[in-house]
């Protein structure tokens, strides 16, 4: 396991970057493009299906060299090797971090030690589960798996939360055009009963199957929703004339309409799901890194095993790039270090992700969990405080909707917000605009290109004056530019492209975690809130008097109880 001898901001490389930032603070992107005629080609890279242009970022060649010097000083290459080799880099939970193993090709071998004289054949285990997932998906899609009344399954409802929901829900929406077998995925996550009610409203119980996704099968929100779903199923099947009385009837119904994604076989059985219908994953896979594991079962059912394997191919291409490319040509490294540059040296407080694709609408929310749950830490690996800003705050909406909502702040606000623009050359859906000839996708992409140009280069007072703008309006219409963006283009939004995009950001998160000296693979901040909620539940239900330990919480619960119907 690599060791970091000092905190990041005390290194010589950090100090050099601070000096560089001070010396170049007034540099304009206009100047950089003028001084470096080949800047665009010099700073554009390709990995798998992704074409990545970094040229509109606020940095020059020297700055990039200094950032990579910092990466080396922090041991990034050693940490990268440790992760891929299966070392326990998740030190607070003493676990390996092997989400990259989930997409190992079938012809690759990979094992890790699990004891003094034992090894686990990780590659074989992964492909065994993928094989079972493939068989299950084929059974659903062919109609050989049927509900208790003999109806084929048309609706697959994933019940999970966090990483057991955000990943497959995002991917299912993004890969909508690949759902050709008549199976529609749905997703329930929130403990708010409106979620389960709204999702199940209008579904045919006889053709609905539920996937209960919980590693431990103890997640309170997921189990509450699973029981609510079974009550809905039994009620609707009873209305259809099905016998739902007695343990045997309920067991038969559950066997036909419920499967589990979990590691807790005993608890899965207690719920009534046969363990032969349980799809496992491992403690070396964190929830937010698990969409390509059995957590993606509902996705595989919807898009089919072949396209799911293409999804994994996209991940693996970026994994290989990240693992083998030198830092100077390594896209996740460069993008991760640019995030550190903006956060720690230029004072950026958030990072926008702007996919110009309605199908990618949930991608920013997915990245919020990936980045903020991973790097939202204030303690280093050795238990000492992080003394510099850490953890990028990700947010965003699809274009062009965002242009009419928050782009005003990006263009003329006082906050520096680096932004990633994600676009696709060829659409799955296109239509003709109002003029009867122009492609609507071409209109979308003209906005895509225009926004990155205006953010970078703006429009100054002299240019406005030449256009005849009234003097009193010129200050209001000046677009300062110098807003940094990264542009990611792909030929089409395919399963492989989506897998590559997800892996790109996974490795960006890893890079930044190494620089800040934090564990990107635990989430203790989530755990305390769960415990507090369980402790307060008796007071919220009225079974006990509230004694939370602070007057605000006690008074709020009292108000809630007073007005609860």
Curated annotation (Swiss-Prot):
CDD domains: SIS_PGI_1, SIS_PGI_2. It catalyses: alpha-D-glucose 6-phosphate = beta-D-fructose 6-phosphate. The keyword Cytoplasm applies. Transmembrane segments: none annotated. SUPFAM superfamilies: SIS domain. It is an enzyme of class 5 (isomerase). It is found in: Cytoplasm. The keyword Nucleus does not apply. Pfam families: PGI. Keywords: Cytoplasm, Gluconeogenesis, Glycolysis, Isomerase. GO terms for biological process: gluconeogenesis; glucose 6-phosphate metabolic process; glycolytic process. The active site is at 373 (proton donor), 404, 530. Pathway: Carbohydrate biosynthesis; gluconeogenesis; Carbohydrate degradation; glycolysis; D-glyceraldehyde 3-phosphate and glycerone phosphate from D-glucose: step 2/4. Its EC number is 5.3.1.9. InterPro entries: G6P_Isomerase, G6P_Isomerase_C, Phosphoglucose_isomerase_CS, SIS_dom_sf, SIS_PGI_1, SIS_PGI_2. One of its GO terms (molecular function) is monosaccharide binding. Belongs to the GPI family. Catalyzes the reversible isomerization of glucose-6-phosphate to fructose-6-phosphate. NCBIfam families: PRK00179.1 (NF001211). This is Glucose-6-phosphate isomerase.
């Amino acid at each position: 396991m690599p060791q970091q001898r000092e905190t990041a901001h005390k290194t010589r490389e950090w100090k050099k970057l601070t000096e560089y930032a001070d010396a170049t603070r007034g540099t304009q992107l206009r100047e950089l493009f003028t001084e470096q005629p080949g800047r665009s080609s010099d700073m554009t890279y390709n990995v798998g299906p992704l074409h990545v242009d970094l040229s509109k970022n606020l940095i020059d060649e020297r700055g990039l060299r200094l950032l990579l010097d910092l990466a080396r000083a922090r041991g990034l290459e050693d940490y990268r090797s440790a992760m891929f080799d299966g070392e326990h880099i998740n030190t607070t939970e003493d676990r390996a971090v092997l989400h990259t193993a989930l997409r190992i090709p079938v012809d690759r071998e990979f094992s890790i030690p699990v004891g003094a004289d034992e090894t686990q054949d990780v590659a074989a285990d992964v492909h065994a589960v993928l094989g079972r997932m493939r068989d299950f998906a084929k059974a659903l899609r062919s109609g050989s798996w049927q509900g208790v009344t003999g109806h084929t399954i048309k609706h697959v409802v994933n019940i999970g939360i966090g990483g057991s929901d955000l990943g497959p829900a995002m991917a299912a929406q993004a890969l909508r055009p690949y759902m050709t077998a008549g199976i529609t995925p749905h997703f329930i996550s929130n403990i708010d009963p409106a979620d389960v009610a709204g999702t199940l409203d209008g579904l045919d119980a006889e053709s609905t199957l539920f996937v209960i996704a919980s590693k431990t099968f103890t997640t309170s929100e997921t189990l509450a929703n699973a029981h609510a779903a079974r009550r809905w199923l039994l009620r609707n099947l009873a209305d259809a004339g099905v016998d739902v009385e007695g343990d045997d009837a309920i067991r038969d119904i559950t066997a036909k309409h419920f499967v589990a994604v979990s590691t807790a076989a005993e608890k899965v059985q207690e719920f009534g799901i046969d363990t032969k219908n349980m799809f496992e994953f491992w403690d070396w896979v964190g929830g937010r890194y698990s969409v390509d594991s059995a957590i993606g079962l509902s996705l595989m059912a919807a898009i089919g095993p072949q396209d799911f394997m293409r999804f994994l191919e996209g991940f693996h291409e970026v994994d290989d790039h990240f693992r083998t490319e030198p830092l100077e040509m390594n896209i996740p490294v460069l993008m991760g270090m640019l995030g550190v540059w903006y956060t720690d040296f230029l004072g950026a407080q958030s990072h926008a992700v702007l996919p110009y694709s309605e199908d990618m609408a949930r991608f920013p929310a997915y990245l919020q969990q990936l980045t903020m749950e991973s790097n939202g830490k204030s303690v280093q690996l050795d238990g000492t405080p992080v003394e510099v800003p850490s953890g990028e705050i990700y947010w965003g909406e699809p274009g062009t909707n965002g242009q009419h909502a928050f782009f005003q702040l990006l263009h003329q606000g006082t906050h520096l917000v680096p932004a990633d623009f994600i676009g696709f050359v060829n659409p799955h859906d296109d239509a003709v605009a109002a003029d009867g000839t122009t492609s609507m996708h071409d209109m979308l992409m003209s906005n895509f290109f225009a926004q990155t140009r205006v953010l970078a280069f703006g429009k100054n007072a002299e240019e406005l004056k030449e256009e005849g703008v009234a003097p009193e309006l010129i200050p209001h219409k000046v677009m300062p530019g110098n807003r940094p963006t990264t542009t990611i283009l792909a030929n089409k939004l395919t399963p492989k492209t989506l897998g590559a995009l997800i892996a790109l950001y996974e490795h960006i998160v890893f890079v930044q975690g190494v620089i800040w000296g934090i564990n990107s693979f635990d989430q203790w901040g989530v755990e305390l809130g769960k415990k507090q909620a369980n402790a307060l539940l008796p007071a919220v239900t009225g079974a006990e008097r509230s004694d939370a330990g602070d007057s605000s919480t006690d008074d709020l619960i009292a108000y809630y109880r007073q007005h609860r119907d």
